[in-house]
Amino acid sequence: MWDVSFIPLRPGSLSGPVTERSDAARNRERLLGAARELIEECGADGLTMDRLAERAGVGKGTVFRRFGSRAGLMMTLLSDAEAEFQGRVMFGPPPLGPGAPGLERLIAFGSARIAYVLEYGELARAADESAYNRFDVPAAVLWHRHIELLLREEGMDADPRLMAMALSATLDPERLLHAVRVHGIEPERLAESWRELVTRVVRGA
């Protein structure tokens, strides 16, 4: 694991280590452990704040004070996986990491993000229930900016920010999960579609 700070998933959270009282840290781990158990038993859709409070043996208010909302809880559960993904993008080998041309990195980013969503899809979809989580949390802004910078690197000057937002929408967790689970589209086909899309966008720039 990279010894650096990463962009946080949750609004207002810190990317570095946070010092907690020992009892607060134990409560946090008990809540997260209970949340993971519930997800294993009944899926992310079955994880409610009421069920979590009951399983962890705490009041519902304690759960809300710790995580803010159900989406905030899902964001916390996703944090470790997101930090690992950020490390691969920012410091890992090319083409996902630095050192490859912009188009190659765009293709690799989309393919890797599709795989990430399919692995952590239930959590990612539940975390995206809040419009703020979907569009404005620091990690989401980071990926929009990453795509924008790669588009600029490839010579796009006709509103690359807006194009980055449009491309990001195709990697929306709920959209990807729907494509795979409802329409039976294979992940490899999604990745190939992303490759063709960004290639057309870049070469048309």
Where are these regions (language model features)?
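Alpha-helical DNA-contacting segments of helix-turn-helix folds
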Residues: 74-81, 120, 124
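Short hydrophobic/aromatic patch on the recognition helix
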Residues: 57-67
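Basic, helix-initiating cap at the start of DNA-binding domains
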Residues: 1-42, 46-55, 72-75
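Hydrophobic/aromatic residues within well-ordered alpha-helical segments
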Residues: 70, 77, 81, 85, ...
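Short, structured helix-loop boundary elements
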Residues: 28, 49, 71, 75, ...
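Conserved amphipathic alpha-helical interaction elements at protein-protein interfaces in regulatory
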Residues: 37, 41, 69, 91, ...
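Hydrophobic alpha-helical connector segments
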Residues: 76, 90-119
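Hydrophobic/aromatic-rich alpha-helical bundle segments in the mid-to-C-terminal region
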Residues: 124-129, 133-137, 141-144, 152-197, ...
